[in-house]
């Protein structure tokens, strides 16, 4: 029986706010998909995450075997999320393919997860039967939904399950004022900042994003998004870039966005296989 282990104690917890260079990182957006496997064995992938100072990573893969391989290699580091994609070819069609439900149900019966996603769904497609069943599975298994979606789709998901917990991938690629409006409306909505740079260009936090972070200090987290194999070689650089702009925030707020929010969101994830 394998176990999702609680995160190791961090030295800076008792030493006060961490210096920017020492900030651990919770990466909320990692993929280890089939096209990465041939040239990046699990041990090498884990070594990259550790070199970057990542203490935990939310990982989903196309297909899920990639996530399971990383979890087997480092269960104390990897938080498994079930992506509804068997290969990348499912990205644009999964929500109309009933076979995806059987895939999800099979994986959920065999393994433990903390989330379903990252998945792509937009607008009215969020009300299609496959998406509705996915929301039901998340509710049944008490899993977070990691949604790469527009505002319309997020609203539809919450109408289906007002108690759903949703991590909004890329903060929807929305403007910070729109992100703030959504966070005010939905208390169970969190945002990752993956594949965005405008919030911390040049090591300085943009004023409109600073206001968003200050209003919702417990709702944002960083992420790399290794959506292609090449992105794995950017993980260390991205972690250091994140530390640079986080250093422009008050230390307590920087710690929250860097890792505390992720740890809090998945605090109950120490469940057995």
Regions found by a protein language model. Give the residues of each.
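Generic enzyme active-site microenvironment
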Residues: 25, 116, 168, 222-223
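Acidic/histidine-rich helix-loop elements
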Residues: 30-42, 89-96, 200
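Active-site gating/metal-coordination segments in enzymes
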Residues: 65-144, 190, 195-198
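Catalytic pocket-lining loop regions of alpha/beta-barrel enzymes
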Residues: 82, 95, 125-222
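Active-site metal-binding loops of divalent metal-dependent hydrolases
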Residues: 30, 119, 171, 224-226
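Bacterial N-terminal signal peptides
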Residues: 4-16
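Mid-to-C-terminal alpha-helical segments outside catalytic/metal-binding sites
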Residues: 2-3, 23-26, 43-60, 65, ...
